[in-house]
Amino acid sequence: MKLFGTDGVRGKAGEFLDSFLAMRLAMAAGIYFKDKSITNNILVGKDTRRSGYMIENAIVSGLTSIGYNVIQIGPMPTPAIAFLTEDMRCDAGIMISASHNPYYDNGIKFFDAHGNKLSEDIEKKIEEIYFDDKLIQASKVDMEKIGQAKRIDDVIGRYIVSIKNSFPKDLTLKSLRVVLDVAHGAAYKVAPTVFKELGAEVIVMSDKPNGLNINENCGALHPANLAAEVKRLRADVGFAFDGDADRLVVVDEKGEVANGDSLLGVLALYLKEQGKLQSSVVATIMSNGALKEFLNKHGIELDTCNVGDKYVLEKLKANGGNFGGEQSGHIIFSDYAKTGDGLIAALQFSALMLSKKKSASSILGQVKPYPQLLTNLKIAEKKDLDKIKGLKELKKDLENKNINTLFRYSGTENLIRLLLEARDIKLLEKEMKNVVEFFKKALNG
């Protein structure tokens, strides 16, 4: 049984991800981290889901049972956990969140002592420990060695300072009217505080979490309400975050929702113009062809990697780069953060607007993405794509029609993601029907 998906362990809270799994997974991770332990402390944070209480208590129980001390910091963005794990010199960090998923899902993400997401090799080792009953039992400590847990409520200030330090000292947000949609999620306190302290006029939406409304018709996956509000209030820009604030969606002053690749492109160019861009930009295999064309036109190389911000970061490290991201809104400025951080990306885009003295729409309009269609098809089984009869011929036929393709399985669900890209939207719509029918027959028998 495989526990880890593309971004930690994730599933329906109380069913797949119940308190038993959370406790045992925490024990397994703790056993792994013990080998390199320095402080014997592990940091635990969460988003605003009600199930976070259940999972947090289970994780604390598991870690303390093997002798670890636990620092609980409550609702906090995922990138804050990455930063604070290193800043507070913990052996590891744990974030309880299902990111952009509905409230009934939850997840567990791990960070090493340096605030990095774990490699697949380390995740595999933790899985092996999880299923090793003898090792789990043998790792329980005597009563006098059981760890302690303490809750700290004032660490938010450390993260706010680090975020503000990413914003240019010679700029101020005083001239900007900004609408923030915090998705009833982990950034509901932090995001408004940062923008207000830097001088912006701030209007906040979806900032009243009740444990069940996270991401519900709001945030990065549902920016329509934000778009309407930006237009109604004649704001300069709108920023939508997801439940754990590791991704960003931008809405311009006209109420248009920006394409994630357009955002990547203009931010990369901004870094280059400042002399701060190192090596090539990294995006995922789902990036729009227009992004590569835009970057190449400005003398910037683009490398691609698998979907997932941890793979973007791995590629950046390998290339010696410092900027990359995903079309979905995970944007990594590795000079400032170890993972995608929606707040940092929002501040950098604000700085770009201010330094250029241009509107959001005129900046984002520099990159004109090609039409793409994405279909998430539910399937009965995940067959090896290389062994599906007729698939090679289908891809060749689409290629001959100047259609780019990407077919890949979801890492967490029984889905195949079907992506087509071309300059002709009508052609895409026609061919997508054929592609869907092909995979229905191939994977649903």
Swiss-Prot record:
A Pfam family that this protein carries is PGM_PMM_II
What's the PTM story here? Activated by phosphorylation.
Please give the catalytic activity noted in the UniProt record. Answer: alpha-D-glucosamine 1-phosphate = D-glucosamine 6-phosphate
Q: What is written in the cofactor note of this entry?
A: Binds 1 Mg(2+) ion per subunit.
Q: So which domain of life are we looking at? A: Bacteria
PROSITE patterns of this UniProt entry? PGM_PMM
**Which cofactors must be present for this protein to function?**
Mg(2+)
The top EC class, named as a word, is isomerase
Any coiled-coil ranges, and where?
Answer: none
> What is a single molecular function from GO for this protein?
phosphoglucosamine mutase activity
Q: What is its EC number?
A: 5.4.2.10
What are the entry keywords?
A: Isomerase, Magnesium, Metal-binding, Phosphoprotein
Q: What GO cellular component entries does it have?
A: cytosol
* Residues annotated to bind Mg(2+): 99, 242, 244, 246
Q: Residue positions of the PTM Phosphoserine?
A: 99
Q: Which GO terms describe its biological process?
A: carbohydrate metabolic process; peptidoglycan biosynthetic process; UDP-N-acetylglucosamine biosynthetic process
* CDD domains linked to this entry: GlmM (cd05802)
The residues responsible for catalysis, as annotated, are: 99 (phosphoserine intermediate)
Check the record and name the InterPro entries matching this protein: A-D-PHexomutase_a/b/a-I, A-D-PHexomutase_a/b/a-I/II/III, A-D-PHexomutase_a/b/a-II, A-D-PHexomutase_a/b/a-III, A-D-PHexomutase_C, A-D-PHexomutase_C_sf, A-D-PHexomutase_CS, Alpha-D-phosphohexomutase_SF
What does the UniProt function comment say about this protein?
Catalyzes the conversion of glucosamine-6-phosphate to glucosamine-1-phosphate.
Q: Which family does it belong to?
A: Belongs to the phosphohexose mutase family.
Q: What is this protein called?
A: Phosphoglucosamine mutase
Biological source species: Campylobacter jejuni subsp. jejuni serotype O:2 (strain ATCC 700819 / NCTC 11168)
